[in-house]
């Protein structure tokens, strides 16, 4: 079997044109370089050099072999470079799974900032339901995920992040638009556009209203918070949504107000548990946490 040391010696002779200079290049003795060339010729059964006195002349076969050997060494050099860049976290790829609300706009900003000084880093962002985030990350199809449903889940490490307050959305001209904070009791008898009954935020909203003895007209439900915002903007009612979606929709005709009592909006970062996250993933996680802490949303 051809040895890498033999190929290194052959390459050195081809580059320098002689045994002595090749020996100096690879820092071994001239007899050692001669032996490596001889062993290589015996291994492949081909004469690589014509010897005339102290001079060497590469054969045609040596020229062909040299092209392949050069590709081999160029590949190794490229791998060395890639490894060095990976160590510096300037190369690599990230696969991130995220549920809808943060993916609308917030995650785009995080990714934009993160790759600004990492030109060789690629990011794939997949927007899927929270339960799917947990499944995909636990199976290691993704490096990191953001999910609402982040309790004890097999194969996952869960890291809670700052909890925000849900907000109240009002249509333009609503009787409550002059209030800085809308209280649950203010919504007595109002048309309340609701999220799906299986939504955690819907359950928490219902609990807050029930605790205050408030009865609303729940004629319209939507499984998507963006649809809820659109319905509010059309004057169909008021709504309680997460701050990410409210912020994303803020350019449209809706009025955003604080809501009391507090309706908490919890979510978490999830990572596979099988092994420590690569450096690139750890740095993205840190950037994500910094961005969350910098948000102007009301925290709990």
From Swiss-Prot:
DNA-binding interval(s): 19-38
Family: Belongs to the LysR transcriptional regulatory family.
HTH lysR-type domain sequence ranges: 1-59
InterPro entries: LysR_subst-bd (IPR005119), NocR_PBP2 (IPR037424), Tscrpt_reg_HTH_LysR (IPR000847), WH-like_DNA-bd_sf (IPR036388), WH_DNA-bd_sf (IPR036390)
Assigned keywords, A-Z: Activator, DNA-binding, Plasmid, Transcription, Transcription regulation
Highest taxon of source: Bacteria
Protein purpose: Positive regulatory protein for the noc operon involved in nopaline catabolism and uptake.
Biological processes per GO annotation: positive regulation of gene expression
Xref: PROSITE patterns: HTH_LYSR
Name of the protein described by the UniProt record: Regulatory protein NocR
Pfam families, alphabetized: HTH_1, LysR_substrate
Record bears the keyword Metal-binding: no
Listed GO MF terms: DNA-binding transcription factor activity; sequence-specific DNA binding
